[in-house]
């Protein structure tokens, strides 16, 4: 089995090293095409205004000056001589749950793999800030991901569907199994931090405020809160079929879908 790895935290990220160790429990034919620099929050974006620069680090290890989407495209269409059987994107430093999935470059890696016709999974590891430092328990995903992936790889997923895996912030022995979930809802509370440079010109940082939401049972955020691995099936089709009839009636037509 051939596996292509990517991420959005960059080629030197600890999560990518963890993902490689996970992948090597499944296959010895593991390829990496990951961004040269951190591409967090770029979602499913393409580089169309600048050329892509590919750097070979070692055999089957490449860094690309581009987005996670660029990396998957380059990996499948340029770097690898034979199409991979599996695309793994991650392991992200921090969970990708609720509305996070719309911003996530990690999710985008799995989206692009799916669009290229390859079974794809996104993996993310929740963490805790302690005394101003980010403490990421990589050992959780490293312990539990291999067996979980072995079970999930045999699934006959519908075309256009991929899986979003999130691992809880706890000790490996505290993980209370895996749960199939749906997306939850968290308020982002994004804030704009206005500053001035040394010449008095304004510049701005986006930052997250306190996040709040209802941790409804069955959602990804509820699963993580209760030390469960969240497995959420996601699909490329963004059509809201529940309102197509109403939209059609508003336009004076019959049902269209």
From Swiss-Prot:
GO cellular component: cytoplasm
Compartments (UniProt record): Cytoplasm
Record keywords: Cytoplasm, Hydrolase, Metal-binding, Nucleotide-binding
EC number: 3.1.3.5
Top-level taxon of origin: Bacteria
Cited NCBIfam families: PRK00346.1-4, surE
Family from the record: Belongs to the SurE nucleotidase family.
Protein name: 5'-nucleotidase SurE
Source organism of the structure: Rhizobium johnstonii (strain DSM 114642 / LMG 32736 / 3841) (Rhizobium leguminosarum bv. viciae)
């Amino acid at each position: 089995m051939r596996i292509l790895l990517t991420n959005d935290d960059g080629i030197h990220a600890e999560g990518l090293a963890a993902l490689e160790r996970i992948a090597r429990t499944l296959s010895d034919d593991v390829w990496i095409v990951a961004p040269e620099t951190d591409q967090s929050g770029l979602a499913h974006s393409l580089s169309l205004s600048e050329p892509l620069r590919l750097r070979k680090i070692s055999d089957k290890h490449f860094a690309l000056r581009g987005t996670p989407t660029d990396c998957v495209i380059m990996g499948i269409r340029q770097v690898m001589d034979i199409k991979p059987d599996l695309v793994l994107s991650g392991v992200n430093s921090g969970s990708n749950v609720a509305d996070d999935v719309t911003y996530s470059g990690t999710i985008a890696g799995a989206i692009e793999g799916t669009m290229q016709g390859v079974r794809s999974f996104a993996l993310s590891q929740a963490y805790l800030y302690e005394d101003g430092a980010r403490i990421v328990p990589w050992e959780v995903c490293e312990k539990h991901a291999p067996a979980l992936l072995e079970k999930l790889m045999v699934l006959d997923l519908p075309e256009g569907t991929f899986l979003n895996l999130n691992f809880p912030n706890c000790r490996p022995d505290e993980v209370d199994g895996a749960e199939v979930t749906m997306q939850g809802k968290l308020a982002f509370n994004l804030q704009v931090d206005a500053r001035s440079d040394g010449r008095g010109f304004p510049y701005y940082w986006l930052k997250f405020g306190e996040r709040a939401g209802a941790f409804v049972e069955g959602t990804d955020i509820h699963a993580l809160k209760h030390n469960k691995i969240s497995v959420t099936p996601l699909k490329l089709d963004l059509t809201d079929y529940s309102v197509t009839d109403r939209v059609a009636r508003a336009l004076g037509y019959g049902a269209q879908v």
